Amino acid sequence: MTHRSNLLPAFFALAMAGMPLVFAQHENGKKENVLYVWASDQAHKAPDFLAVVEFNEDSAHYGRVISTVPLPPPGNTGNEPHHCHLSTDKKVLACGGLLSLLKGQNGIFFFDVSDARHPRFLLSTKAVESSITDDFLPLPEGGFLITQMGSASGEAPGRIAEFDGQLHFVANHFGLMSLVQEWPSTPPLDGFNPHGISARPDLNLMMTADFILPTSTLNGTTGVALRNTVRIWDYRARKITKTVKLMSPDGGPALGIMDVKMLPGDPNGIGYVAGMFDGHIYMIDPRTGTGTAAFDCEDVQPHVDTPVVGGMGQILATPKSGDRLIFALFQAGQVGMLDTTNRSNLKQVPGAIVSFGANSGPHNLVLTEDDSRLVVSDYFLNEDDQGVIHFEGDHKVRVIKVTHDSLTEDTRFQLDFNTAFPTGPARPHGLAMK
């Protein structure tokens, strides 16, 4: 029997009441000086861990690992660390374990980062009707919406798990946040496997992107089932109002909609998604519930030939100017910028592209609050002997300097997770800055 104690209700208090999330300012007007990287030991022997990295550009140790915070046992290996996100008040870091289910472990982890350079592990937990934890959307009032790509058994339908800001400690290191709900109350049965999530609370709109049926990627299954749907939500009611089924220009379905990003400030709530295996970026119009191809990644210059058409577009990032979209191509090894002035016909910003080399694997993209730096992690997912997904990347974490019309690699920042730790090569995935 577990025993709850030490209620900590304050971690997710709103930092600036009434301020829209996408326009939050730096705490005390300061730039981020600490980078968190949520990672795993490639050999699955050392614990999964949070790396704390010097992110102060004025420091002589810029780009060096300050410390690591390993997960405590039990359940501290084999979680496949995936995405992470800071709470609105930047005091708690929430992290996900994509494959925790395969070992019967909790898959949602929380760290106290109120002392930015000395984070400490708080607790782990899991949802009830869902698993395969993916992305986190911090809520202005505290807590998170979390995409759970699979059901409790890793199949369909998945859910959006909502946790409020009440933290409860229980016996051992396991715990429960106050789980408000898993949404929607009656989930659709047409391939609801949400991966990406984006919201415009000011418009009462939210979007989620269905990517893949998780269990279909495991050994012994009949084949990978990719999804091509985007869900439009009533943000406040937590209710799906429209389902957008995307078709590629060749007439077939879009293949694997991993991420979704809504443009800041767009009056209609326009968003964008990338078809990972069909090579297109699609515009989503929530008013009409439609999606159309807006850019062909085969047209990216310089062009890199890759096994997957379009170089394998995955994660997107949206500067607050509202007229730019940043994308990463995993197999092409490129990070580029698109002009979104014409919402349905995106154009590559001339010269705004950084090439790291074919198969370097840029995947996760996170902008600083002032949009001046973009952090990139070069690792997606390797299921090793458990499944058919083997997208390793080169395990580097990089920084790109960003202006309205340019992307330039910050060569002062050098961080290679193959050599940074005495335990051996590690796989960097989740990113957050404070």
Residue positions per predicted region:
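Blade-loop segments of beta-propeller domains
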Residues: 63-137
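Beta-propeller blade signature
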Residues: 51-55, 106-114, 157-167, 223-237, ...
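Loop/turn-rich, solvent-exposed surfaces of beta-rich toroidal or solenoidal domains
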Residues: 306-390, 395-397
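Short, conserved, GDST-rich strand-edge loop motifs in beta-rich repeat architectures
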Residues: 37-44, 95-105, 147-158, 208-227, ...
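Structural signature of eukaryotic scaffold interfaces centered on beta-propeller domains
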Residues: 25-31, 80-89, 136-140, 193-204, ...
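Asp-box/WD-like beta-propeller blade repeats and closely related beta-sheet repeat scaffolds
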Residues: 107, 113-201, 210, 216
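Surface-exposed loop and turn segments in beta-propeller and other repeat-based domains
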Residues: 64-79, 123-129, 172-192, 240-256, ...
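Beta-propeller domains
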Residues: 87, 189-342
